[in-house]
């Protein structure tokens, strides 16, 4: 799948646990592979994967195949699921990121708009990853115990500016989150 994505001519980046692992080296079991693309790039993504992969839209649990008949999604905050064929397991979860004029827009804080290059970083492998403080914000809203080790591994590596951005975002999104006391 990495080769397929490397040839995709639009921005994409790894998110979730893979982004935390790339930032920290902290390894854990991954349930799936999550990437993100700008919602405006869905037609290009569907065209790129066409003929080799089945791409489905998952909007609120409603699945719909994307291809010649449907090339776009109705909800720019939804997901795409990718698999090799109709009976194969899903191999990729594509989280759609709303955009404004091709600028990344935070799903939780819509006033946070930035170029993709500012909210992602290139790893040693050449792959782009969502900045760890943004990943932690998304994880914080879910309040899952499995995300605490990611926070523990990431916190010492965050710069003062990254900590401040996370603190400000947490205050707006999850003001009573227990991570506040450690930032």
Model-inferred region functions:
Residues 1-183:
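Compositionally biased terminal segments of proteins
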């Amino acid at each position: 799948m990495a080769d397929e994505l490397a040839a995709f001519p639009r921005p994409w980046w790894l998110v979730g646990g893979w982004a935390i692992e790339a930032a920290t080296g902290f390894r854990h079991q991954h349930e799936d592979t999550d990437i993100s693309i700008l919602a405006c790039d869905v037609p290009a993504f569907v065209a790129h994967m066409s003929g080799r992969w089945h791409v489905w839209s998952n909007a609120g649990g409603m699945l719909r195949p994307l291809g010649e008949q449907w090339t776009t999604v109705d909800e720019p905050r939804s997901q795409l699921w990718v698999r090799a064929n109709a009976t194969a397991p899903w191999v990729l979860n594509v989280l759609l990121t709303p955009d404004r004029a091709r600028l990344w827009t935070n799903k939780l804080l819509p006033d946070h708009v930035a170029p993709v290059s500012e909210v992602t970083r290139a790893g040693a492998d050449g792959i782009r990853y969502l900045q760890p403080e943004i990943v932690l914000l998304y994880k914080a809203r879910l309040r899952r115990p499995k995300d605490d080790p990611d926070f523990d591994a990431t916190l010492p590596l965050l710069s003062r500016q990254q900590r401040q951005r996370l603190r400000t975002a947490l205050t707006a999104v999850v003001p009573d989150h227990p991570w506040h006391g450690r930032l």
